[in-house]
Amino acid sequence: LNFLAEEGRCRPGIQLAATHLLRIGVALLGLRITFDQVTALGWIPVATVIVAVIVTVLSGVVLARFFGESPAFGTLTGGAVAICGASAALAIASILPKHPNSERDASFTVIAVTALSTLAMITYPIVVAAFGLDHTGAGVFLGGTIHDVAQVVGAGYSVSQQTGDTATIVKLLRVGMLLPVCLAIGVVLHVRSSETAHSAPLLPWFAVAFALLVAIGAQLVL
């Protein structure tokens, strides 16, 4: 999709950015989440987000099978929609087994989820106003439905300060689901490959770093 990918001189840099730098960036997302933010929401929004993420990922797998795509593609797209858009797509793609269409699937998912997220940033505040949601309800809706963090911030604060704050917290809670989702994927891959000579890692290192940085961020004021 990008002519630079065909340039031999660019490939090492692209490969570095798509692997090591990407995983470091995903791990650093953990610094944006604090336990105080989560507890401030209350248990109902937290439970709703957790259930929604699980259902969305599983729905992606089911719909992929229905349309003749692989479960890996369903996991990739479902995870991107459920968690944090392009960042989740690239993180999940980096731990899924590689196949001839891996790059195509990842590129499609990133482009599609970014386009839909931008469209949602523009249209969802109008939907919120049409349904007359209060600031908290609007924040939960925007943070729980828009894919990427930046678009959630843009949509939320275009409504009000309180809506933006709530939307951001809800969205970061979804980002926090990246760790358990990656863990679940790692467990499935580990079990499926346990009988082969090369067993898949139970949990990718950047997911462990993500969890550690969440704990560190909870103790620091950045």
Model regions: which residues?
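Oxyanion-binding "anion nests"
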Residues: 156-204
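Entry/N-cap segments of selected transmembrane alpha helices
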Residues: 24, 29, 33-61, 107-118
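Transmembrane alpha-helices that form the ion-translocation and gating core
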Residues: 47-80, 120-132, 220
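Cytoplasmic-side transmembrane-helix entry/capping segments in multi-pass membrane proteins
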Residues: 12-26, 45-50, 70-81, 104-112, ...
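Hydrophobic/small/kink-forming positions within alpha-helical transmembrane segments
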Residues: 54, 118, 122, 149, ...
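Structural signature of multi-pass alpha-helical membrane transport proteins
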Residues: 1-18, 28-37, 183-222
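Helix-coil boundary and interhelical linker segments in multi-pass alpha-helical membrane proteins
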Residues: 35-44, 100, 126-138, 157-166
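Alpha-helical membrane segments and immediately flanking helix-loop junctions
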Residues: 69-119, 137-160
